[in-house]
Amino acid sequence: MFEVIKRFFRDRKLRKFASDLPTGFIPLSEIHTVNVVINVEEAGFDLLKEDVLLWGRAAGLKVNIYFFDFRKLGKDEILMTTIDKTLLRKGLDWLGTPNVNKLTSLFEEKSDLLISMVDNGDYPIEFLSKCAKARFKVGRHAFKGHAYDLVVSGASNEDLRSDSRRIFQEIKDFLLKIK
């Protein structure tokens, strides 16, 4: 019963904050600003971050990287990312909605490309994907309501789902093919 009520309020919040910016495929030559969301819990996230930054510099793009960090940190553990660009579990409200004020650049400023490297269907990433103002959206998990213009997922016979760097390479290769 509680899940039904939560879903009702989540849908209302999605409708309220959903991006009204038309999206679609955009050639790399028309892309100037990129927002990338990386899951800190995935193995090799720091290497993926470096790959994204190198690609952005090489292509002359302004890249903003945001992090999902839903780990339970112990007393001795420290946050490995900048606090202003990191979405923490304690930063969610009772519905699981991220604080819109914390990630204002993602929700209010229009960007040309959003790349979500988070490979799960949890509500916080659904909210972020549907509400981010980007002209072209790429993600790893499909959501009801077409949150992304392009969904890149691994083949069922390979372990591509766990290799974010290979997925990112595939996304870069695809972006080069759009004319």
Region roles according to the model:
Residues 42-61, 65:
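Histidine-anchored nucleotide/phosphate-binding helix
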Residues 16-21, 86-104:
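Glycine-rich, highly charged phosphate/nucleotide-binding loops
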Residues 62-70, 138-139:
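Short internal beta-strands
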Residues 146-179:
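Active-site-proximal region of nucleotide-activated glycan assembly enzymes
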Residues 119-132:
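An aromatic- and histidine-rich active-site surface loop
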Residues 112-115:
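Structural motif
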Residues 1-33, 43:
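Short N-terminal or domain-adjacent regulatory/targeting segments
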Residues 135-145:
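Active-site proximal beta-strand in glycosyltransferases
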